[in-house]
């Protein structure tokens, strides 16, 4: 394991170390990938917590309920493993699989300005939530927004009409009064 600096804009967060598991230095990981165990396809992780950055290598991992248990190269002590809690697990964007047209990674949607069909700026995508039925866009007010309300919009074909990454905008079918 080594310390390094990596431009954070080239990295995508795919999970987070939440705690230690067992006595041999394994860690419990919350995965942001779908399916959950896709995170285990990436063998080299960049760990990030605040300004602290480390490179680690995944030796093995397994799904245990809704959490992953991972063994990292050189990490064999429970107390040392405990210090890894709250590190985000990142990989370079270039390692993510290509998507079909009209499909987007969540990180690509974050920061997009959201306009309704009347051209009203509702806000900016802050983050997304996974609800089970469909993902939900959390749209927070930004400079030039119609008002200062936070909105929750379903990320569905019916609601999201167009995504334009180049212009940094998303058009939605959404009444400003909702």
UniProtKB/Swiss-Prot annotation:
Lineage: superkingdom: Bacteria
InterPro entries, A to Z: PRC_barrel-like_sf (IPR011033), PRC_RimM (IPR056792), RimM (IPR011961), RimM_N (IPR002676), RimM_N_sf (IPR036976), Transl_B-barrel_sf (IPR009000)
rRNA processing among keywords: yes
Residues annotated as domain PRC barrel: 101-178
Gene Ontology cellular component annotations, sorted alphabetically: cytoplasm; ribosome
Pfam families: PRC_RimM, RimM
Entry keywords, A to Z: Chaperone, Cytoplasm, Ribosome biogenesis, rRNA processing
Subcellular location: Cytoplasm
Any one GO molecular function term: ribosome binding
Coiled coil: none
Keyword Chaperone part of the UniProt annotation: yes
GO BP: ribosomal small subunit biogenesis; rRNA processing
Domain notes: The PRC barrel domain binds ribosomal protein uS19.
Subunit details: Binds ribosomal protein uS19.
PANTHER family documented for this protein: RIBOSOME MATURATION FACTOR RIMM (PTHR33692:SF1)
Its job: An accessory protein needed during the final step in the assembly of 30S ribosomal subunit, possibly for assembly of the head region. Essential for efficient processing of 16S rRNA. May be needed both before and after RbfA during the maturation of 16S rRNA. It has affinity for free ribosomal 30S subunits but not for 70S ribosomes.
Assigned protein family: Belongs to the RimM family.
Name of the protein in question: Ribosome maturation factor RimM
Species whose genome carries this gene: Stutzerimonas stutzeri (strain A1501) (Pseudomonas stutzeri)
Gene it is expressed from: rimM
């Amino acid at each position: 394991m080594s310390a390094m600096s990596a431009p954070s804009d080239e990295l995508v967060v795919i999970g987070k170390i939440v705690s230690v598991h067992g006595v041999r230095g394994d860690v419990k990981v919350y995965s942001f990938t779908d399916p959950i165990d896709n995170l285990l396809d990436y063998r080299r992780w960049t760990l990030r917590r605040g300004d602290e950055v480390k490179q680690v290598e995944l030796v093995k991992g397994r799904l245990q309920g809704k959490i992953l248990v991972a063994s990292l190269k050189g990490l064999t002590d429970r107390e040392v493993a405990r210090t890894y809690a709250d590190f985000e697990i990142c990989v370079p964007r270039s390692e993510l699989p290509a998507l079909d047209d009209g499909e987007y990674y969540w990180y690509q949607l974050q920061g997009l300005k959201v306009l309704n069909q009347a051209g009203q700026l509702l806000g900016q995508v802050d983050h997304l939530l996974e609800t089970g039925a469909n993902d939900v866009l959390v749209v927070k007010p930004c400079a030039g927004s119609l008002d200062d309300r936070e909105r929750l919009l379903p990320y569905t074909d019916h609601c999201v009409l167009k995504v334009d990454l180049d212009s940094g905008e998303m058009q939605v079918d959404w009444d400003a009064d909702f």
